[in-house]
């Protein structure tokens, strides 16, 4: 029998906490006795968090390594369904573990000789988190509303075709995104007018 830490690989050799071990154990059980065995065997996670998303609801965020994100997304719909059964209806979302590098300033520019890649910028990482969050639905547009006090509200338009699948999770998505990035976001399913 594998240990519970088999499915979780933390950076710098840190030990997973109790909650992460629970998630890891759940993934192991799924791997043992479901038809997802072949796909799950190669995959692991880097971290897991449980957060409050308004009205006393909780959501589970599972962080996965960026190179494995595509493989997770192939089985994500079924994986999420199974995990939500196990964790009594808490919404589960998968997000890739990305790093944001600080903006080079005049002082820090000399230290790192390499240019900061676009994928490590704050904007790119926040956009990518949004894409991961709403998978399997797609973002078809966004509007940013700047209020008079300078605060921003991002309106994200999702694909109408997926409305039935993700509509009940929209509040969770907003809560998770606010927690991870500090940005307010509202999801909509607009009718398209040409």
Curated annotation (Swiss-Prot):
The keyword Aminoacyl-tRNA synthetase does not apply. GO terms for molecular function: structural constituent of ribosome. Its main location: cytoplasm. It is found in: Cytoplasm, Cytoskeleton, Microtubule organizing center, Centrosome; Cytoplasm; Nucleus. The keyword Ribosomal protein applies. Component of the small ribosomal subunit. The ribosome is a large ribonucleoprotein complex responsible for the synthesis of proteins in the cell. Required for rRNA maturation. Component of the small ribosomal subunit. Belongs to the eukaryotic ribosomal protein eS7 family. This is Small ribosomal subunit protein eS7. It comes from Xenopus laevis. The gene is rps7.
């Amino acid at each position: 029998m594998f240990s519970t830490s088999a499915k979780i690989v933390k950076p710098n050799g840190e030990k997973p906490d109790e909650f992460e071990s629970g998630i890891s154990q759940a993934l192991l059980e799924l791997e043992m006795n479901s038809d997802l065995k072949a796909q799950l065997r190669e995959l692991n996670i880097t971290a897991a968090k449980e957060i409050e998303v308004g009205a006393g609801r909780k959501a589970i965020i599972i962080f996965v390594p960026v190179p494995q994100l595509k493989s997770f997304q192939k089985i994500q719909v079924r994986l999420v369904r199974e995990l939500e059964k196990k964790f009594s209806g808490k919404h589960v979302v998968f997000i890739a573990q990305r790093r944001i590098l600080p903006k080079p300033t005049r002082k820090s520019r000399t230290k790192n000789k390499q240019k900061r890649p676009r994928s490590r910028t704050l904007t790119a990482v926040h956009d990518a988190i949004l894409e991961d969050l709403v998978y399997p639905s797609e973002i078809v547009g966004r509007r940013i509303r700047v209020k008079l006090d300078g605060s921003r509200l991002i309106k994200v338009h999702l694909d109408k075709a997926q409305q039935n699948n993700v509509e009940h999770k929209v509040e969770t998505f907003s809560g998770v995104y606010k927690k991870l990035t500090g940005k307010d976001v509202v999801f909509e399913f607009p009718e398209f007018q040409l």
